[in-house]
């Protein structure tokens, strides 16, 4: 496994405030696994520091206001929650917001390789090691705003499994589906949906061949089950550049791309970053 954390990072660590004026924001859906977009100050002042559940939150400028783009974990309880906001002059306060309930559908899959459902002790050691690597990647922070918060599709194909599905493998309950699946022929290209820097590549027990991209301000995306990886940690990708090929490595029932988007260390629905006409295909 290769990871960007071993590389010198000074050349990309910017001390500048994220002052990008966004052309568009992602879709706001304040539910578990969704995104809350919350105005947190006027753009006449410098950007505030915003935190949620111990993680720093993306803040971007839209017109004359600063907005927090808050990732909401799938396990988050519905109800009242609060951001911690610290102004540029050091004054801290809390700002509450509401999270609505959402019931995700069930999905039952049959996996032919039983080890991918009930790993042996050696597999579990590997899984724990790989989980730690991915957790570190999802917590990565680069103080530079993304080029755009509306993503392109990372692969051409049909949506085969929606985000948030309550999954059962061989009738055994497992973690919910924390990504969006796009079914396509093996060997078809997978491209960066927005500008990003490769921070991790590797072959994982469940995820197969995997690439993780940092887009800035705590936004990280992940691409799983690739048949081939075409990038290395530190590679700077422009929107539309190929990072690998569709495959069926790891725990799969067929060739597809599993696409994950993480905000402030919370896995959120990637569809919320797609244009409305593409999101409509999921409804």
Predicted features along the sequence, with ranges:
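Conserved, short, structured surface segments that act as functional micro-motifs
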Residues: 210-214, 219, 235-283
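Bacterial N-terminal signal peptides
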Residues: 9-19
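Short, well-structured beta-strand-loop connectors
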Residues: 189-199, 228-246
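Zn2+-dependent peptidoglycan hydrolase active-site motif and core
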Residues: 193-227, 255, 260
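Surface-exposed, glycine-biased beta-strand/turn segments
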Residues: 96-207
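N-terminal secretory signal peptides that target proteins for export/translocation
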Residues: 1-7
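Cationic-aromatic interfacial patches
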Residues: 23-96, 101-103
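Terminal peptide-recognition signature
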Residues: 54, 83, 159, 182, ...
